[in-house]
Amino acid sequence: MLYWLLYLKLFHYFPPFRIFRYLTFRTAFASLTALFTGLIVGPIVIRRLRDFQIGQYIREEGPQAHQKKAGTPTMGGLLIAIAILVPTLLWADLSNPFVWIAMFSTLAFGAIGFADDYLKVVHHRNLGLTARAKLGFQVAASIMIAIALIVLQHSGEYSTRLMVPFFKQFHPDLVIERWAVHPQLWPLAFLPFVAFVVLVIVGSSNAVNLTDGLDGLAIGCTVIAAGALAVLTYLSGHATFATYLELQRMPQIGELTIFCGAMVGSAIGFLWYNAHPAEIFMGDVGSLALGGAIGTVAVMIKQELLLPFIGGVFVIEALSVILQVGSYKLRKKRIFKMAPIHHHFELLGWSESKVIVRFWIASLVFALFALTTLKLR
């Protein structure tokens, strides 16, 4: 909005507005706007949630130290969504389709999480949405994102080819080209791409959701992952850097740097109130929205295969649950004392703060390694 008004419309009359053309300037101010939105609106949201008695339910089989958190205001992801979307609308070029896809993902997955939280907290249904319903909505939202990207691929603004870490020239296409030209088979040509997009986005959304079990854990890791994605979006949209690093350059993709910057700022603002001991929890409305946004950005900048490194802690948390459930069903034995794995370390005697900070450190190491792979090819 400000880009359109102050740069495209008014900079001819007031040359200093030319600064709004610079992506780095708008990203920095999007981050700051998101941060201060979170800091200012946070107390209002916390107070309102308390007034409506929207508090967190703590399961009895969890660590006993967590029982004192019962009743802490939840559904704070509403604050995160506001702090992401408002700065993006203010500072991004709203003629850019990738920006709208990222915002759609945040809203769609946030709405799924909101419905889940609403049923659990307001209607006192312990499980919220059924697993089948939640997964169905997530898949539907991801398919819509995939279709939008296919449309952009037809117009030459997007590529369905994968960037494979550690390989310079290996870029397999997820569209079956010989079927794409067939009048009857062409819809099937895009099935591998659509399935892959669904896997990445739904997996990312649920992985962040599983990580959200300790004060500040998921949101701290989100700051790091979103920061790494901001670097990658900037490099992918910059002609010189993309050529030098042999990235798939898509000129319009750089505008997503502003969205990622807003995600970083909103996450830091939320962390101010979510740090141990937390004054507010994000709930599914926050974790699903953030995970969906992270997965969607990774798909759009062609770094889907790098996402397991960028969000390494999220992947480990999700794998710990999969392994625990699989082991118990197959062998009637548990691998961990409790899953997700952050609870395992709590039951080993680590304090909550120690688990959180060490997982943040691990997340930072994973993200730095992901960025170094750009040259390790």
What are these regions (language model features)?
Residues 43-61:
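Membrane-interface helix-loop junction between the first two transmembrane segments
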Residues 49, 118-127, 278-279:
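Membrane-interfacial helix termini and the short, flexible loops that connect transmembrane helices
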Residues 58-72, 126-137, 342, 347:
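Juxtamembrane helix-capping/reentrant segments at transmembrane boundaries
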Residues 61-69, 101, 124, 178-186, ...:
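Short juxtamembrane and helix-loop transition motifs at transmembrane-helix boundaries
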Residues 95-103, 122-137:
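Membrane-interfacial loop-to-helix junctions in multi-pass inner-membrane proteins
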Residues 111-118:
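Alpha-helical transmembrane segments within multi-pass membrane transporters and channels
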